[in-house]
Every structure is written in structure tokens, then in C-alpha cells.
A protein has these predicted regions:
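Donor nucleotide-sugar binding/catalytic pocket of nucleotide-sugar-dependent glycosyltransferases
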Residues: 132-146, 151-173, 184, 192-196
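Conserved acidic donor-binding segment of nucleotide-sugar-dependent glycosyltransferases
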Residues: 310-311, 315-322, 331-336
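Short hydrophobic beta-strand element within catalytic cores of glycosyltransferases
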Residues: 295-298, 308
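A charged, aromatic-enriched C-terminal amphipathic alpha-helix characteristic of glycosyltransferases
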Residues: 337-369
Length: 376
């Protein structure tokens, strides 16, 4: 604990020095010209980085040079700053220029998630007066924020996006090739799980329980009683799930896709995708599955209730309800014509989260109103 505090304090000193140095350059007229909006992303090649990169790419197509992305908030000395992570916002908020308009996402988190989450939420709520806008991706989270006393007019409900032109339903040839690549046998039911559900960025043998890896394994064990199950995993830190599948005697493959095109091909092998989390902001795999024509059974978390109509465009169950997850999965897998109607409905539902739509909404609902208030 003492070492963590020392590291944390050292980081804060570094943040302050960097931020005040950049502000001094700006006052001297030596800071480079920037677009009016800066999105702060994470260095890790994962969801927050992708979120910011795709919004910026699409927004600049709509309104050229309106936004840029950075991993260094100290470089943002004027204009609008939008943080892709509420944790980044918390780390940097005391060192940012008061000339800036402040925006952050709040994608997930609730008091029931434990002491650390509760402390973070309390600190976040203390910071709300400093914020001009808060972006929530899901109705569940927006309603939660309002219940905690956040003014509704500060919250923009904008989904996390999906590359619907990249994540497309597989052709028969693409499906056969993907399944052959991972050694799937004839008649096996391939269930996908593409996420990070271990603690840290190593092997991930300690489960990140908020992601429900224990629920996933319990659901697979139940489905194995009735079906020849094969599990396809992607994402880092999957050691806990891999060990669990080996104990269950379930055949599986784990492939960490090096890029988004490779990730899209993994969905071609799937018959079903399971989201078994206890808390989510999206997840991105929910939208990617629906866009790819892969049926989803999800717990009632994140964007799932906004996108899925139970029995029409997927399956929706309460968190931790293993029996319900297995029942919905069996029901969907037994639908006629390969669940074609459900797949079609799912893809239509997810189009509201195409990145071009998401970027347009950030421009119209968040950035432009703040630019007008600033006289920009």
C-alpha cells in the first residue's frame, strides 16, 4: 500500500510538471496549433484507444480537423478535452487548464462492485461540477448517474461504436475457412468469448470477476451436457478461463487477434457469443457479434438492454443466472433457418452504433454546443 501511494504521488508530481510546463508554452505562444477538440486515449491497444481513434477518424470526415487524439493530456491547454476513461479524468483533472471545457466518459461502475469502485465513484461525483459534459454509453449507466445526483442535462447518452462495414456476416466459404483454421470438428457448436477477464496484462490466472469468467465457465459446463461445445477465445489475460475449460474437458482455441481485420474473421467461426459480465460499458464484442450476424446471449449489463430485444434480436438474462444463459443459448441454437430472422434483427439494431453515427452525435450533442458556449 505504501509503495502504491509513493508511485501514485510520483505520478501526480509528473502530471503537474508536464501540465504546467505545457501551459507556460501556450502562454508564451509557443504551443502548436491544435484542433478545437482533443480526445485523451490510453496507450494500451484496447477498447479506450479504439474508441477514441474511431470517433476521431469519423468526426474528421464529417467536420475536417475538428478533433485529434493524444495519450498526453498535458498537451491540451485550450478548447475541449474529452477523456475516454473516467479513471484518466480523475488522475489528471486537478492539473488541467481552466481555459478548457471538460468532458469525460463514464462507461461503467457501481457501488456494488466493491470498496475500490465505491471510492472511485465518490471521487468522480465530487468532480462533476468541474465537468461540462459526461458521456454515458448505456441507459443503465445514465440512469445510475442521475440517481447519484448528476444533473441529467450534463449527460449525453451516446453508444460505444462498431465498424459495421468491417464486422459483416460470414459467407459460407468464410465460415468454413474460419472453423477449419481452428480445428473445429463437424457438428461442434462454437461459442465465442473475446475479452480481457483476468487481472493485469499477464497470464490472467486471477479472474476479474466483474467480467463474469466464472459465470462463463458455469454456462459452458451446463451447455456441455447437451451439446458438443467448442470455445473460441480472444483477448489478453485469459488464463483463468483456459484453465477452467481444460478442467471441464472442453475443446477450445485461443487466438489474440493482432488487428481489427483479423478480429473480424474470428466471428466467422462462431455459432453463438456469450456476454456473462456483471458490469459493462458496452462491451464492444456485443456490437461486433450483432453486426457479424452472430447471435448473442447477454446478461443485463451495459448496452445490451438498449440493443437486444429478448427473443427477437438476441437473448437477455439477469447477471449470474447460469440456467437462464444456458436456456436462452439452447433456444437460439434451435431456431429454424439458422436463426436468420434473429441475426437480421440484431444487425439492424446495432446500426445505431455505427462509428459514423456515434461521431456525428459527439459533434452535434457534445462538442458544438460547448464550442458555441465558448464562442469558438
Amino acid at each position: 500500500m505504501i509503495r502504491r501511494r509513493l508511485v501514485s504521488n510520483a505520478k501526480k508530481v509528473g502530471y503537474a510538471a508536464s501540465a504546467y510546463g505545457q501551459r507556460a508554452l501556450a502562454r508564451a505562444g509557443l504551443a502548436p496549433a491544435r484542433p478545437p477538440v482533443g480526445i485523451v486515449i490510453e496507450r494500451a491497444d484496447w477498447a479506450v484507444r479504439w474508441w477514441g481513434a474511431f470517433i476521431a477518424e469519423e468526426a474528421n470526415k464529417i467536420s475536417p480537423d475538428i478533433v485529434w487524439i493524444t495519450t498526453d493530456p498535458s498537451k491540451l491547454t485550450s478548447g475541449i478535452i474529452e477523456f475516454g476513461s473516467q479513471y484518466q479524468w480523475q488522475a489528471w483533472r486537478k492539473f488541467l487548464s481552466p481555459r478548457c471545457r471538460m468532458v469525460t466518459t463514464f462507461f461503467h461502475g457501481k457501488y456494488e462492485d466493491g470498496a475500490e469502485a465505491s471510492e472511485h465513484i465518490d471521487q468522480f461525483l465530487e468532480s462533476v461540477p468541474q465537468l461540462d459534459r459526461i458521456v454515458a454509453s448505456a441507459s443503465i449507466v445514465r440512469d445510475r448517474l442521475i440517481g447519484w445526483g448528476v444533473p441529467a442535462q450534463k449527460i449525453a447518452l451516446i453508444p460505444i461504436g462498431c465498424e459495421t462495414n468491417r464486422f459483416l456476416p460470414a459467407t459460407d466459404a468464410e465460415r468454413q475457412a474460419a472453423r477449419a483454421r481452428f480445428g473445429v470438428c463437424e457438428g461442434e457448436i462454437v461459442i465465442g468469448s473475446f475479452q480481457k477477464d483476468g487481472v493485469g496484462w499477464g497470464e490472467g490466472t486471477e479472474p476479474k470477476l466483474i467480467k463474469g469468467p466464472d459465470v462463463f465457465l458455469a454456462a459452458i459446463a451446463e451447455l456441455k451436457k447437451h451439446l458438443p461445445v467448442f470455445v473460441l477465445l480472444s483477448g489478453p489475460a485469459r488464463g483463468y478461463v483456459r484453465a477452467g475449460l481444460e478442467r471441464l474437458g472442453v475443446r477450445y482455441a485461443h487466438h489474440y487477434a493482432p488487428d481489427r481485420d483479423e478480429l473480424a474473421k474470428l466471428y466467422h467461426a462462431l455459432d453463438l457469443y456469450l456476454v456473462t459480465s456483471r458490469e459493462e460499458g458496452g462491451p464492444m464484442a456485443l456490437m461486433e457479434s450483432m453486426s457479424s450476424g452472430v447471435p448473442v446471449v447477454s446478461t443485463y449489463v451495459g448496452m445490451a438492454p438498449d440493443l437486444i430485444t429478448d427473443g427477437v434480436s438476441g437473448g437477455l438474462v439477469q447477471p449470474d443466472d447460469v440456467a437462464a444463459i444456458a436456456e436462452r443459448a439452447m433456444r437460439i441454437l434451435s431456431l429454424p433457418d439458422g436463426a436468420s430472422a434473429l441475426k437480421k434483427a440484431a444487425r439492424e439494431s446495432v446500426m445505431v452504433a455505427d462509428w459514423s453515427v456515434v461521431a456525428r452525435r459527439h459533434i452535434d450533442e457534445v462538442w458544438k454546443p460547448l464550442m458555441q458556449r465558448s464562442g469558438a
